[in-house]
Swiss-Prot record:
InterPro entries found in the cross-reference section: RpoY
Signal peptide coordinates: none
Protein name: DNA-directed RNA polymerase subunit epsilon
Protein encoded by which gene: rpoY
Catalysed transformations (reactions): RNA(n) + a ribonucleoside 5'-triphosphate = RNA(n+1) + diphosphate
Length: 70
């Protein structure tokens, strides 16, 4: 399943909407997403599963590139 993750790069700063970044990640669950991103110390605001029509929309209208976490 593909997830869209809204996050701030620095955990120590107050979240500001204009600084929110997005990445797309393939994982089995929201917990798996958070586990994979844990080592980056991102301030994760929201994790959203992207399926069906929503996925097709994101592919057509956004820069949907899956992040590879090693």
């Amino acid at each position: 399943m593909i997830f869209k993750v809204f996050y701030q790069e620095k955990m120590t700063e107050v979240p500001v909407r204009e600084n929110t970044k997005v990445l797309y990640l393939e994982a089995t669950s929201e917990k798996d997403v958070r586990t994979k991103l844990n080592k980056f110390a991102y301030n994760i605001e929201f994790v959203q599963s992207v399926t069906g029509n929503h996925l097709e929309y994101e592919k057509a209208n956004a820069d949907l590139t899956l992040a590879e976490i090693v």
